[in-house]
Amino acid sequence: MAEILLTSVINKSVEIAGNLLIQEGKRLYWLKEDIDWLQREMRHIRSYVDNAKAKEAGGDSRVKNLLKDIQELAGDVEDLLDDFLPKIQQSNKFNYCLKRSSFADEFAMEIEKIKRRVVDIDRIRKTYNIIDTDNNNDDCVLLDRRRLFLHADETEIIGLDDDFNMLQAKLLNQDLHYGVVSIVGMPGLGKTTLAKKLYRLIRDQFECSGLVYVSQQPRASEILLDIAKQIGLTEQKMKENLEDNLRSLLKIKRYVILLDDIWDVEIWDDLKLVLPECDSKVGSRMIITSRNSNVGRYIGGESSLHALQPLESEKSFELFTKKIFNFDDNNSWANASPDLVNIGRNIVGRCGGIPLAIVVTAGMLRARERTEHAWNRVLESMGHKVQDGCAKVLALSYNDLPIASRPCFLYFGLYPEDHEIRAFDLINMWIAEKFIVVNSGNRREAEDLAEDVLNDLVSRNLIQLAKRTYNGRISSCRIHDLLHSLCVDLAKESNFFHTAHDAFGDPGNVARLRRITFYSDNVMIEFFRSNPKLEKLRVLFCFAKDPSIFSHMAYFDFKLLHTLVVVMSQSFQAYVTIPSKFGNMTCLRYLRLEGNICGKLPNSIVKLTRLETIDIDRRSLIQPPSGVWESKHLRHLCYRDYGQACNSCFSISSFYPNIYSLHPNNLQTLMWIPDKFFEPRLLHRLINLRKLGILGVSNSTVKMLSIFSPVLKALEVLKLSFSSDPSEQIKLSSYPHIAKLHLNVNRTMALNSQSFPPNLIKLTLAYFSVDRYILAVLKTFPKLRKLKMFICKYNEEKMDLSGEANGYSFPQLEVLHIHSPNGLSEVTCTDDVSMPKLKKLLLTGFHCRISLSERLKKLSK
């Protein structure tokens, strides 16, 4: 893992050298020379780390100490850089020349110590004949495979067809005992893939449905809340008495629920008190997956069990072939030599029939040349015992990653098992960690480079795609529990991060912690009460119900912390006092608060001049101070709510940004900023803004957005919430890059073809008054794929989606979503040529009883 620390040091030294050059010019040129020397030496050391690791794996025990020395050196250099940069910046701010000189002298002395250690390491390296492999292209841009996964069948069940047919018949059998099907087997066999395919196929035959990930550390209250939301329990009833109201609703509904990855029977004992038995006359069904047959037997009886087995050799090779070649490639092995085919079969044999091992191996091989030599090297690395195949393959696939991608992959282990992780979060945390840097001459943004890395991880089958965005990009993802365990094990071994369970013990080890994640309230509280020394902590993740994390933080400075993520339970609201010591976290770059958290960010946050991302979840009421605008590095300011909650967050006049304090060049996201605290003329300065959401849009803002030449030329996503009818006509036709538009208007709003961007892909209309004239405009949009109408008022009871006189009617529309319509009783389409690509019609919300024409019935949920 030394290579990860070395990469971090290299990236940080590039940043510091650039800052010194800009800020100090020739005054501290010799410091820049030291930084450049650090960068060169760390690159050199990194170039032979892989060779050293190979020698260690080959049995050369002497190399182990060398790798440990390299890791400690890289860690100390990272500490030095993280400590040095804020001091220089602070002294520059107040023009403390003597203090700055003192810092520089101190830094130079530390560099001399490091130089002596580098000489010793290089001497030992030569003694052990460790060579420079020069195989660490950390700057590679992963574009070739960027879109390979986009059109893949996410429910591929090669080799499981018989299992699928048997389970489908069992689920639809009226005499199914207990109404439960239990899919059991060892990790990696495809239990979840098979269960989700079944669930999605049969759920339309039930009145309501729910899919829940249970995982190793479940919380019954959160599982029940998740089920309640999916089956349509009202928010009021969830707040009043979740358990009783959920049970009452399920008793009268025919439901199907998938509980994925149940580890033990204790959680079922809690859930069954609320979930009614499935063997009633109603005919409800329960699908569970578990690696433990006894769990399935306990829940559904012996007859419920369906044990998955490893794939037979031919089915294994069929899956391997499907993943190696493009999905539309009919030639397959036609152009391959017989020897390459045999090597491929041997590789598949080492995977032991485990689908996860097979697809991960195929993902790794897709990144290599399709030659006998390249594949033989993989085969030789897999060992000779079939039973070791899966573990070997997973570790080998990790080592096959580009060095710059390895810490990005390990980051998935910071989240709990089965957690759905937003791509936005991952990308911006990687950037905050300096895992992703933009080199000189590269015109692409860091976010684009990070997205390439995420695409590559999905393409290699190391990460599972969960959701896509409106334009086919990754919205969220998950990691398989076996790969999650690999992340945790590798991270612990290398001190990359620790989970709370292994953080206790030797105070010396605790003091070395660089990243820590808490999944449990009790463990978190016990840990902080032990008064640990956390001077080196960079990343803190807390997934908890107890809001005391904020009070515990008051006792620590966290001077090197640059990523803070607090995810609170949704089941209750927490009023917190965020300590003023937040202002001491001078290295903080990424802040995310999620859950029902009420409080105020302290004014001391203005000292956090390196903040890049502030992300406040839509359920949180967190007030930002006015000084948040002063961060020169701010890229994303997100408040994910456009209702009263967001208004409350900004109920301070001092939030109004000073046009001269704003640093607009880096800003890419401003989401749900109240118009009254945002001066429209600032829009001209936001030249790199990609996403904008404004609450309470004024006429002056509409006018500014509607001028002939677009003021926001890079804008891709625009969300506007109007509190009253705008007198100005909105015109967005001059914005070619806007692909996603959200308009929230409580009254009638005049719209025509000039009101919309020409390349719109997703459109949401909320609280609109919809008539046939607006509908006629929408039908002509040439690229619109998804249309959502949220609590709209319809002036006519019947909505006809058929083509107009010109023949147009949603030529590219794939999804139409109508939520809680007011005044609409019928949706029809009378011709066969309209909406030729429509795949799904969603009717959701209360009182959504709409009659549909025959064609639309087939597409509705």
From Swiss-Prot:
Site (Contributes to the specific recognition of ToMV-B7 viral mouvement protein and subsequent resistance to ToMV-B7): Y767
Chain positions of LRR repeats: 225-248, 305-327, 388-411, 449-472, 510-536, 585-608, 609-631, 652-680, 689-710, 712-735, 736-758, 784-810, 811-835
Keyword NADP on entry: no
UniProt GO MF annotations: ADP binding; ATP binding; ATP hydrolysis activity
One Gene Ontology biological process: plant-type hypersensitive response
Binding site for ATP: G185, M186, P187, G188, L189, G190, K191, T192
SMART domains the record matches: AAA (SM00382)
Complex formation: (Microbial infection) Interacts with tobamoviruses mouvement protein (e.g. tobacco mosaic virus (TMV) MP, AC P03583) at the plasma membrane; this interaction triggers defense responses leading to programmed cell death.
Family affiliation: Belongs to the disease resistance NB-LRR family.
Other comments on record: The Tm-2, Tm-2(2) and Tm-2nv alleles present in the tomato mosaic virus (ToMV/TMV)-resistant tomato cv. Craigella isolates GCR236 (AC Q71BH0), cv. Craigella GCR267 (AC Q71BG9) and cv. Yukang 2 (AC Q5MLE9), respectively confers resistance to ToMV but not the tm-2 allele present in the ToMV-susceptible tomato cv. Craigella isolate GCR26 (AC Q71BH1).
Protein name per its UniProtKB record: ToMV resistance protein Tm-2(2)
Organism from which the protein derives: Solanum lycopersicum (Tomato)
